[in-house]
């Protein structure tokens, strides 16, 4: 039975990578730590269950990373995907600290492997977890247990009582029963509100009911909403989220990484009216895959279709659900519920606009269109080899960008301009400080690890004084 009478040094709200990085760092610094994880054991870990890698600065090749990936290139990649919507000081701090993130995770028992082959082409920039997100979490929870960290599962943090900028106690529901947890410091690491369709609906209307939730159903945003209501500063656009082009046949909740479709750069993508609406070859897929969920969400009925042919199948990771195939574009349209004449016209116009070049699937090649709007800037090849292939798309939402504003000590800033006396934040709940829009593959895990470590160390230091 948990000791609810005890006063802990550090309470961590959340149970994913950011939360465990914080809890472990605090415990290693000598603090007594309790973790409140909303999910039961089989579902523990939030979206970290579905992750694969983190993006890390490195000056030379490592056991799992090729070449080098330095600060200026890293920051330039971030600026491109966010269009400058980032706090540069926090971003650069995160990038620099990412250099030691893999070693920290290794010290927790996490093992790494070289990049997998596929469309994302991350061998130089991202370190992959051996066994994926579940193996990562299992290692972190084992380390937490070894350090004597108390973990409460099925425990929803419903209210963090703030007075004069300081959290006094947490009101929780532990296995359905109300309890209180007292702690000298609190770290909010409970994620965003991507699984809360009601909250999403405030910005997206009925379209939110058609979004597929890629990860945990427990990301309801309760801690975030509670803290914003009590004067924590808001950061990030509430309409922005990380979302990918998911297979429309995927589960509506918790489908994970495998439901993402990586065929977009080697296809044309049309909406319900069989019209293209964006440049499919705009940039390398790791810098663009996270905009496609939003693009699809903006289409009629939040639906789209990737159209390609048999020559492209080998250029991207295979889908869980089989592709839809037909011997003619018209027959393919019938299977998709599209107007055959309109799809034939769209494919025909695209084929006529293609200017062949040297096709290089992992680089920005010179295969492009000319005189077509929207253009296809790279990887443009005529769709002409039978059978023709299609994949139905829906937006798969990963996390939201609305969050808590923090400083470089991971302290939550209040609307009066001051930092909270004892409240810190890490992970998706504060990622909007650095990711104002767009995404870099693996960077969410980097933010969670870096700010989790900072929050844990700072909370432990404060609790001891």
Task: Give, region by region, the residue ranges found by the protein language model.
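Glycine-rich loop(s) and the adjacent beta-strand/alpha-helix scaffold that form part
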Residues: 174-247, 454
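Conserved redox-cofactor binding core of oxidoreductases
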Residues: 44, 94-178, 182-184, 195-199, ...
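A glycine-rich dinucleotide-binding beta-alpha-beta segment and adjacent secondary-structure elements
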Residues: 342-433, 437
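Beta1/beta-strand and adjacent pyrophosphate-binding region of the FAD-binding site
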Residues: 4-18
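An active-site-proximal "capping" alpha-helix that borders the catalytic cofactor pocket
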Residues: 223-230, 444-462
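An anion/pyrophosphate-binding glycine-rich loop and adjacent beta-alpha core
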Residues: 224-226, 230-344
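Conserved N-terminal/central alpha/beta ligand/cofactor-binding core
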Residues: 32, 38-150, 159, 267-276, ...
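Short, well-ordered coil/turn residues at beta-beta hairpins
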Residues: 14, 183, 189-190, 272, ...
